[in-house]
């Protein structure tokens, strides 16, 4: 069974889109940091705090503890999906943080977690924000 968490945030101000962009930019500017495996994965409250800073990503798990980020992107055709995946791959190499990628005709699905801790850490949200900048 897969659980899903989605940010349920009260939007303040008259322009929620601008607020969302400001939140993403803060994460986008950060660098992914390698995890040595001794770091604890984020708990639910930390996950919710960071989830508010990225748009359209869902937090899922398959066994009640190993949370991961997931987002599906839609495209006009296979080639556009492939171009997007190539850009994601380039960012992943630059950051040293590699998501699981699934794609086909008209879609790409990205799954992000920190494999060393089998959960979520700040770098996962940083990578998600960087991918959203494509």
PLM feature spans:
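Short, Lys/Arg-enriched N-terminal segments with co-localized hydrophobic residues
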Residues: 16-23
């Amino acid at each position: 069974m897969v659980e899903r968490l989605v940010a349920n945030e009260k939007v303040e101000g008259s322009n929620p889109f601008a607020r969302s962009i400001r939140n993403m930019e803060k994460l986008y500017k950060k660098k992914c940091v390698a995890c040595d495996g001794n770091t604890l994965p984020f708990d639910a409250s930390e996950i919710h705090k960071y989830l508010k800073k990225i748009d359209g990503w869902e937090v899922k798990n398959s066994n009640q503890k190993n949370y991961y980020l997931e987002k599906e992107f839609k495209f006009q055709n296979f080639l556009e999906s492939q171009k997007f995946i190539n850009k994601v791959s380039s960012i992943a190499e630059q950051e040293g943080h590699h998501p699981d990628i699934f794609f086909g005709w008209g879609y790409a699905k990205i799954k992000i977690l920190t494999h060393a801790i089998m959960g979520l850490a700040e770098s996962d949200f940083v990578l998600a924000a960087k991918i959203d900048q494509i």
